Amino acid sequence: MNIDDDLQALTKQEATLTFSHFDHNTAWELGSALRSAAERARLSIAIEIQLAGQTLFYYAMPGTTPDIADWVRRKRNVVNHFHKSSYAIGLRLQQRQSTLEERYGLSVRDYSAHGGAFPINLAGLGCIGTISISGSPQLEDHNLLVSTLAHFLGLSLPAVH
């Protein structure tokens, strides 16, 4: 696949992976599902779910290091700024041969356009929060998050390559 194909797939993921409702219990259940999926894949990642700026779920798996929390924060900031997945923003920048700082004036100290953060979209409303993971290569982070989210919502979506 090329970047254009991946961006189309990402747009479909963002449009399809929407919630009819989202609350504290949803965050707990989804965070637990992500933890289980990471354990099955033998990954050491950190998982964060925020709703309207409030952290509802956070878990750092054994084997993670403190800097992973900063990666989670920086990826989350990208989703909060653009209401798009961090991986999609990274691919768009790659396609334009640009960076967050060059194009938008966003410092790499606070923003990271690497895969692993995804908007929580509420049907009829839009982005109300973020789901962020970090600890694996960016495509692996993105695909784990999206496949778990799709399963959680009872949907089937192809992975991005």
From Swiss-Prot:
Q: Which family does it belong to?
A: Belongs to the UPF0303 family.
A Pfam family: HbpS-like
Instruction: Supply the name of the protein.
Output: UPF0303 protein Spro_1996
InterPro entries in the cross-refs: PduO/GlcC-like (IPR005624), PduO/GlcC-like_sf (IPR038084), YBR137W-like (IPR010371)
The family database entries (Gene3D superfamilies) matched by this protein are listed as:
Haem-degrading domain
| Organism annotation | Serratia proteamaculans (strain 568)
